[in-house]
Amino acid sequence: MVRIFLLYNILNSFLLSLVPKKLRTLFPLSWFDKTLHKNSPPSPSTMLPSPSSSSAPTKRIDPSELKRVFQMFDKNGDGRITKEELNDSLENLGIYIPDKDLTQMIHKIDANGDGCVDIDEFESLYSSIVDEHHNDGETEEEDMKDAFNVFDQDGDGFITVEELKSVMASLGLKQGKTLDGCKKMIMQVDADGDGRVNYKEFLQMMKGGGFSSSN
């Protein structure tokens, strides 16, 4: 199955959190794999696991974690993800999917048939993907490498201020909109003072809780 996952970041105070491969849905591998074309996502049938096909989750989902991820899609905060909101989120990442395919994606998750995805339906999907992650044998080290590669957009082994800003903007996040704000975040974890974050610094940052800001 095509590997799909979602990174989300920024908690209450510029805190970067990672959900490694927990949301293998909606976002094709092509967004992360620089050798592929961003605008050629796989079909919805290969992108979305079916929540009903999974057994009951063995891991308790953190409600606050679930809510943060859900709110990234629920732009107007009404408790439902519409097709339009899904489309906007994908377009923010440079991913363009035909209207009929978006409808199929919503339909696959939409248990009550109202044409939207509510928090309960999202939790069912999220739980099945978390369960799959815990059973697929992948390691935290692999997750960290995948995450670093998303931020390291040019593949040079460093996360720059510009790259951090680009990723945050593509995820539609409000925090860190300015280069100055992102520069302060980089400085928090830039141990060698070169203005960039290398993989070692990235690992140390993740162990410490994430990018933080005194603002």
UniProtKB/Swiss-Prot annotation:
The species this protein belongs to is: Arabidopsis thaliana
The molecular function GO annotations come to: calcium ion binding
| Underlying gene | CML5
Q: What is this protein called?
A: Calmodulin-like protein 5
Question: What taxonomic ancestry is recorded?
Answer: Eukaryota, Viridiplantae, Streptophyta, Embryophyta, Tracheophyta
Q: Under the cellular component aspect of Gene Ontology, which terms does the record hold?
A: endomembrane system; endosome membrane
Domain EF-hand: from-to ranges: 61-96, 97-132, 139-174, 177-212
Quote the InterPro entries the UniProt record gives. Answer: EF-hand-dom_pair, EF_Hand_1_Ca_BS, EF_hand_dom, EF_hand_pair_protein_CML-like
Q: Where is this region: Disordered?
A: 38-61
Q: Which residues bind Ca(2+) 2?
A: D110, N112, D114, C116, E121
